[in-house]
A protein has these predicted regions:
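A general structural motif
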Residues: 1-3, 32, 83-85
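Metal-dependent nucleic-acid phosphoesterase active-site entry motif
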Residues: 1-17
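Amphipathic coiled-coil/heptad-repeat helices and related helical stalk/stem segments
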Residues: 18-22, 73-74
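Nuclease catalytic cores that cleave nucleic-acid phosphodiester bonds
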Residues: 36-119
Length: 119
């Protein structure tokens, strides 16, 4: 099973570009996967006034996880990936650099497809 944690920027990108994240990940993995979203990322959508994005992803039946409430969003994402051996799907360069240093497998967009950003 492939577990993927989705960052806020990926949710907004999919919504704005009318991309179906489940279809993209299905094409990429060619096997089963689970999508996790940290509650803090969902909360960020409200702050940046992207309620439509939040509702769109809630309709996917994703796993919303309340994890490490005391830390900032990036550290929470990284901690969850390390704790659960998940891949991180993000377009945030700074977050990708931190994840790479920690050995977290990173997914990113390659046009309208998904790619592994590190090995």
């Amino acid at each position: 099973m492939n577990d993927v944690v989705i960052d806020t920027n990926v949710m907004v990108y999919c919504f704005d570009n009318k991309l179906d994240l489940k279809d993209l990940l299905d094409d990429f993995f060619q096997s089963s996967f689970s999508i996790f979203i940290i509650k803090k990322c969902m909360d960020e959508l409200v702050v940046i006034k992207k309620q439509g994005v939040k509702n769109f992803f809630l309709s996917y039946g994703v796993n919303i996880v309340d994890f490490n409430e005391g830390k900032n969003t990036d550290d929470t994402l990284l901690d969850f990936c390390m704790d659960k051996a998940c891949m991180l799907f993000t377009e945030d360069r700074g977050l990708r650099a931190k994840a790479n240093k920690l050995g977290v497998k990173i997914l990113s967009f390659d046009g309208r497809a998904v790619k592994i950003s590190n090995k």
